[in-house]
Structures are given as C-alpha cells and as structure tokens.
C-alpha cells in the first residue's frame, strides 16, 4: 500500500511516530473510544466520526473534487468538496474547516452545520468499509481552490443538472449520494430554490 497522508504516521512533539487515530462512536454519535484510521475502515468497519463539506459558489454551483490517485481509499473518484475525520477530541466543525484548507487551499467564507447522517458503505474495489457517523456542513467558496495534488486530482464547480449528468457517467465515492441527500435541506436554504438542489 502506498504511503499517503491517510496512511502515513505523524511525528509527535517528542519525535516519535504516531498513527492517525479516529473517534469511535455509538449509534447516537457519543464517543466510545479510538481506533487507528486504516483499522477502522477494514471490514466489517468500526463506526467512527466523520465530516462532509459541500461548498458552493455565488451562482449556486457545487464544488466537487476528484480524489487523488494516490489515496488509499476510493482513489480517482469524484466526491463532495471535502470529507474526512476529526482527530479525537477535535470538533467536527474545526476539522471540516482545517481539512478544506489543507486539501483545497481555501477557507470557506461561510460554513454552517447541516445535520448528521449514519451509513455503512462497503467499497468493493478496496475491501474497505465506510461505517460513519457523518457531520454535514454547507458553505460558500468565494476564492478559487488551490488543491494539494497529494489529496485532490481535480476540481469542478457544477450545477445540479451538471452533477446529475456527471454522476451518470463518472465514478463517484460510495458515500456521495448518501451525504448529498442528507445535506439537501441545508443546501436548498443556502443556495435558494432557483439553484435546483
């Protein structure tokens, strides 16, 4: 398996390597422990905290990202603006803002909570499982993305109609439609009825 930001270890303040840890949660989203990131995604999967971000431009178009080919999980597929996992004890909102900046080089000019959704999506291609309690966020992107190529292969702003066309032709992450559908009420509130979300 290639070393990517997701599978790499990080140096702690004393110089030793630390594995990336995730918060394990119960069905209500209450923290019950921690697990190493890759282990939490191996079948059958462990329910853990995650976040998904949906950013829109002033025309109501959604910013999509195609995940970098070097990602250990779902490489090369299209997905929402940003998704990831808070570190243990990190607020999902803070993690969402942090990772959006790390992956896309932009800070949302507005970021609002849009609810939560729980799902279990096996990925047949990798054998990994997304078993997540996902915190949803919607917001505005008023600057052009500057993606980190280790994380993001490409970006695109799309209307609802363009998304439907792209989704019919190109591969998307297993979780994409689940998180999009769960976030739609907040997306409609943000973008207005004319955007068609």
Swiss-Prot record:
UniProt pathway: Isoprenoid biosynthesis; dimethylallyl diphosphate biosynthesis; dimethylallyl diphosphate from isopentenyl diphosphate: step 1/1
Alphabetized PROSITE patterns for the sequence: NUDIX
Gene3D superfamilies per the UniProt record, alphabetical: Nucleoside Triphosphate Pyrophosphohydrolase
MF (Gene Ontology): isopentenyl-diphosphate delta-isomerase activity; metal ion binding
Entry's localization field: Cytoplasm
InterPro entries for the chain: Idi_bact, IsopentenylPP_isomerase_typ1, NUDIX_hydrolase-like_dom_sf, NUDIX_hydrolase_dom
Residues annotated for Mg(2+) binding in this entry: 103
Reaction(s) catalysed by this chain's protein: isopentenyl diphosphate = dimethylallyl diphosphate
EC number, as in UniProt: 5.3.3.2
Amino acids binding Mn(2+): 41, 48, 85, 130, 132
Keyword Hydrolase: no
EC category name: isomerase
Residues of the Nudix hydrolase domain: 46-183
One cellular component (GO) term of this entry: cytoplasm
Keywords carried by this UniProt record: Cytoplasm, Isomerase, Isoprene biosynthesis, Magnesium, Manganese, Metal-binding
UniProt-listed SUPFAM superfamilies: Nudix
Job of this protein: Catalyzes the 1,3-allylic rearrangement of the homoallylic substrate isopentenyl (IPP) to its highly electrophilic allylic isomer, dimethylallyl diphosphate (DMAPP).
HAMAP family (alphabetical): Idi
NCBIfam families according to UniProt: IPP_isom_1, PRK03759.1
Similarity section: Belongs to the IPP isomerase type 1 family.
Protein name, entry field: Isopentenyl-diphosphate Delta-isomerase
Organism: Streptomyces griseus subsp. griseus (strain JCM 4626 / CBS 651.72 / NBRC 13350 / KCC S-0626 / ISP 5235)
Lineage: Bacteria, Bacillati, Actinomycetota, Actinomycetes, Kitasatosporales
């Amino acid at each position: 398996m290639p070393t990517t930001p997701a599978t790499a270890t990080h140096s702690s303040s004393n110089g030793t390597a630390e594995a990336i840890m995730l918060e394990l949660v119960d069905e209500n989203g209450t923290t019950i422990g921690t697990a190493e990131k890759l282990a939490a995604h191996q079948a059958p999967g462990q329910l853990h905290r995650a976040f998904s971000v949906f950013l829109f431009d002033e025309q109501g178009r959604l910013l999509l990202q195609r995940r970098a080919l070097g990602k250990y999980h779902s490489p090369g597929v299209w997905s929402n603006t940003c998704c990831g996992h808070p570190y243990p004890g990190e607020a999902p909102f803070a993690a969402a803002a942090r990772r959006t900046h790390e992956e896309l080089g932009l800070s949302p000019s507005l970021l609002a909570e849009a609810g939560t959704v729980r799902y279990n999506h096996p990925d047949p291609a990798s054998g990994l499982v997304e078993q997540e309690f996902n915190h949803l966020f919607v917001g505005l992107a008023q600057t052009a993305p500057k993606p980190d190529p280790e994380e993001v292969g490409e970006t695109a702003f799309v209307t609802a109609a363009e998304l439907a066309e792209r989704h019919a032709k190109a591969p998307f992450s297993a979780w994409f439609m689940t998180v999009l559908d769960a976030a739609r009420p907040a997306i409609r509130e943000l973008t207005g009825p004319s955007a068609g979300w």
